[in-house]
């Protein structure tokens, strides 16, 4: 098992065991299933108190992308480039946010314990889709795709999930 596999396994195990919410394990399973199918490129932007990312849809990768935002205080959202909230939220973090957390761990932009705390802080907060912030995330992403700014994606490979 590689160091990356070990970090991801530690994060996923700790997330399942420390967040007392029955909706989280099935969402983790969906995220891992998605990552096991094929390579994925995730654009991750993490600061001391905010995680923002862009993730392509698994079912419609050429048509649909999601912007996510998770703050250390527990505020979060996920929505499409058409500025519609993610249908998988249902009041809790969705698989897209979990995917972004895993990519953050893999890229060493956040620690396991830090990301667990951030997720734990979401327990009493409902998602609130923030269109201006989502738009800003998508504009930054498009600027990176167009080569206007440098924002390198994190590549997640199916091999990263051999331990699952």
Residue ranges and their predicted role:
Residues 1-164:
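Long, low-complexity, compositionally biased intrinsically disordered regions
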């Amino acid at each position: 098992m590689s160091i990356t596999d070990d970090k991801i396994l530690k994060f996923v195990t700790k997330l399942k065991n420390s967040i007392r919410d029955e909706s989280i394990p099935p969402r983790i399973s969906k995220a891992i299933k998605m990552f096991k199918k094929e390579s994925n490129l995730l654009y991750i932007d993490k600061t001391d108190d905010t995680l923002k990312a862009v993730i392509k849809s698994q079912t419609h990768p050429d048509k649909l992308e999601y912007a996510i935002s998770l703050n250390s205080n527990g505020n979060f959202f996920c929505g499409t480039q058409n500025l519609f909230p993610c249908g998988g939220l249902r009041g809790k973090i969705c698989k897209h946010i979990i995917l972004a957390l895993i990519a953050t761990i893999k890229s060493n932009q956040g620690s396991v314990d830090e990301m667990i705390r951030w997720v734990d802080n979401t327990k009493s907060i409902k998602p609130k889709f923030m269109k201006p912030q989502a738009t800003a995330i998508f504009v930054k992403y498009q600027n990176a795709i167009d080569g206007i700014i440098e924002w390198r994606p994190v590549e997640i490979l199916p091999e990263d999930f051999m331990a699952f």
